[in-house]
Amino acid sequence: VRMLRRVWNEIKSWYMRELVRDKGRLEDIVEYSSNVLKIIDGIEFEEFSSNILVYFATMKNVEIVGEAAYMLTKEFKASHPEIPWKQVEGMRHVLVHGYSQVLPRILWATAKENIPEIKAQVEKYLNETDWEHYCGE
């Protein structure tokens, strides 16, 4: 019984640490999604695609959103299938490993259409979860 209790406590401790990490990753997704929306606010595609600073700032922030999603636990992603996690992670992989293949229109569509949806959904998760219960905050 002691052994089972110790194993259970270790599993529970690991799980709580992962929840804390997931919360931080979700906060990163919101922060960097917000950056994307600020960067592209009030501009049209032509300026986006011709302004190297705007383009690469958007690219880097979308990449970080994808990295944060990639680092979420499998359990969290499985329990929140409303977001297409594989596609978010896939965009990150393309940006990191094949950025010359990213067409400005694809990045623009991601920033304009997908990022606001992802941000809203993640904010909802953050607000609806009782983090104090899980993380002792």
Spans of features found by a protein language model:
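Solvent-exposed interaction patches of small proteins and small membrane subunits
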Residues: 1-137
